[in-house]
Amino acid sequence: MGRMHSAGKGISSSAIPYSRNAPSWFKLSSDEVVEQVIKYARKGLTPSQIGVILRDAHGVSQAKIVTGNKVLRILKSNGLAPELPEDLYFLIKKAVAVRKHLERNRKDKDSKFRLILIESRIHRLARYYRTVSVLPPNWKYESATASALVA
């Protein structure tokens, strides 16, 4: 998929393993993987960080293959899911950082333009999450209260 606000084509991507079952050398049970996911979530890690740790330290290529559920679904069933979706959270965090930079550097026109692009992405993503009922229908991004969302 191409980039939203630049000319990049985005041709590089990772290949998902074709096999839909756990490899023969994999010894962990699905309950042990779920326990690991819950343990890392309680430490405050995001779902993607949990997936990276499971891949690198425990040899779990995909949690869905081993457990039957994705990491976020495991977190939701245990009441540990983040209140904001991860991609929206990090966009808001980036917008807060750019806005803080602009308070110190008022003449930085490029950062002002980039902030507009970031906030456009936030509004677009929030509209999507409202339509699929991940966010409540009256949820709205406001730059004044954004720092409270990511704190």
Curated annotation (Swiss-Prot):
Task: Supply the InterPro entries for this chain.
Answer: Ribosomal_uS15, Ribosomal_uS15_arc_euk, Ribosomal_uS15_N, uS15_NS1_RNA-bd_sf
Q: Which domain of life is it from?
A: Eukaryota
Q: Could you tell me which Gene3D superfamilies the record lists for this protein? A: 4.10.860.130, S15/NS1, RNA-binding
Q: Which GO terms describe its molecular function?
A: small ribosomal subunit rRNA binding; structural constituent of ribosome
Q: Which residues form a coiled coil?
A: none
Q: Which GO terms describe its cellular component?
A: cytosolic small ribosomal subunit; nucleolus
Q: Which keywords has UniProt assigned to this entry?
A: Ribonucleoprotein, Ribosomal protein
The GO annotation for biological process reads: translation
HAMAP family for this protein: Ribosomal_uS15_A (MF_01343_A)
Enumerate the NCBIfam families for this protein: PRK08561.1 (NF006331)
The family annotation for this protein states:
Belongs to the universal ribosomal protein uS15 family.
* Protein name (Swiss-Prot/TrEMBL): Small ribosomal subunit protein uS15
Q: Which organism is it from?
A: Candida maltosa
Q: Which gene encodes it?
A: RPS13
